[in-house]
Amino acid sequence: MSETSPKLRAELEGIPTYKPGKPAAADGPVAYKLSSNENPYPPLPGVMETVTAAAASFNRYPDMACTSLMAELSDRFGVPLAHLATGTGSVGVAQQLIQATSGPGDEVIYAWRSFEAYPIITQISGARSVQVPLTPGEVHDLDAMADAITDRTRLIFVCNPNNPTGTVVRRAELERFLDRVPSDVLVVLDEAYREFIRDAEVPDGVEFYRERPNVCVLRTFSKAYGLAGLRVGFAIAHEPVAAALRKTAVPFGVSQIAQEAAIASLRAEDELIGRVGSLVCERARVADALRAQGWTVPESQANFVWLRLGERTLAFANACEQAGVVVRPFAGEGVRVTVGESEANDIFLKVSEEFRKEL
């Protein structure tokens, strides 16, 4: 047998492995998972019934065009069907965007630290990542990002709110930034946590999409809508971009169950608003308690908070796990903590209080 291995693309060497939030241990003391920014509530009313009914058609392929879901989204956002595209979560759509715009020799700009998938999906395409450090306040440095644009730039991600810091870019600064971006460079406003925003100065990205053909908005059903396990997200973009997304989509990638669950979730708006409101209240309670303990906590507009711990990051994460909650450490930088059930948040706050005393 030959010992020669099949030749693989050189661009794949050195790609970092995506690290999902660690699950709660099934056989240990850990009871709460605060590591993946999931919604702690069960599916919205009507979703389980819809999913159960859709399960009867497992033997059939899903509607590849997501016809009913696209119609629902078109009505919800007031956009043409031709300006919509769906995918396996917003990260799946983000990867399609890079495939459609960027290849070897091209550049993709994004803030860092930001969403962990950006460097992975960029390198898969063969493009080069241009990482622009956050400001000392953990916010996108849009001036520096604009300065980083070259004739090789093809796409720019603006994660708003930013994952994992929860910080936001406000309307005036985003407008100034967009004015500096060449019209042939695609700007992707990644708004996975849009529903949790309460700052009136943070714009809805759809406003900018309506005015600028080079703006694309990403949304997901994984966070506020609580469908993380079903993998469905979507993009709103002008027709050339949306059409390219449909071309690069994995055939039948969004299951029929995911499509039906997304539609049912959209129709449960009142319950969604109530649940998100409760999580926003918990977010404020957790952040206020942390600041009272002496922590520096960036103002979060997402469903998580960020603590910059540097070299103490892993020790803090281990302390949380031993107490019964799992958080998401970024070694050498900090931890992201999902706002979960009040009981879980209380456990986390006890750990943070004790840990703070040791610093």
UniProtKB/Swiss-Prot annotation:
The keyword Transferase applies. Its cofactor is pyridoxal 5'-phosphate. GO terms for biological process: L-histidine biosynthetic process. Pfam families: Aminotran_1_2. It comes from the Bacteria. The modification N6-(pyridoxal phosphate)lysine is found at residue 223. Its EC number is 2.6.1.57. Residues 1-21 are annotated as: Disordered. It catalyses: an aromatic L-alpha-amino acid + 2-oxoglutarate = an aromatic oxo-acid + L-glutamate. PANTHER family: HISTIDINOL-PHOSPHATE AMINOTRANSFERASE, HISTIDINOL-PHOSPHATE AMINOTRANSFERASE 2. Aminotransferase that catalyzes the conversion of aromatic amino acids and 2-oxoglutarate into corresponding aromatic oxo acids and L-glutamate. Belongs to the class-II pyridoxal-phosphate-dependent aminotransferase family. HAMAP family: HisC_aminotrans_2, Phe_aminotrans_2. This is Aromatic amino acid aminotransferase. The gene is pat.
